[in-house]
């Protein structure tokens, strides 16, 4: 199972069902991702030495050449609080600051479904769904 940090507001938007598309570059662990795989997302930004986490299941994966093309199709499900493709691209580029990464890798629209409730545990706990 893949375990990945997810920052706010994306963590809460996925949990409440507003965000059903996760956007990632087609590299590393995400290059090998396939439908039915499980990802545990965690967030420890609230402090208090606590980690919030939940699991999602991958439903499907689409590849795109650019963030613009991906957002033309999926902006409302990938970035539900964002109304323009231009602003959405700016947000996504903050996470992928290396210019060569943006051109080297395809962009993935990962259709996801939450399969577990949020749990709050001490940061040192093991992962499990």
Model-derived features with residue positions:
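Compositionally biased, charged N-terminal/linker segments
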Residues: 1-35
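Short coil-to-beta transition motif at edge beta-strands of beta-rich domains
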Residues: 31-45
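Residues that flank catalytic or metal-binding motifs in active/ligand-binding sites
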Residues: 35, 54, 108
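Short beta-strand-centered aromatic/proline hotspots
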Residues: 49-63
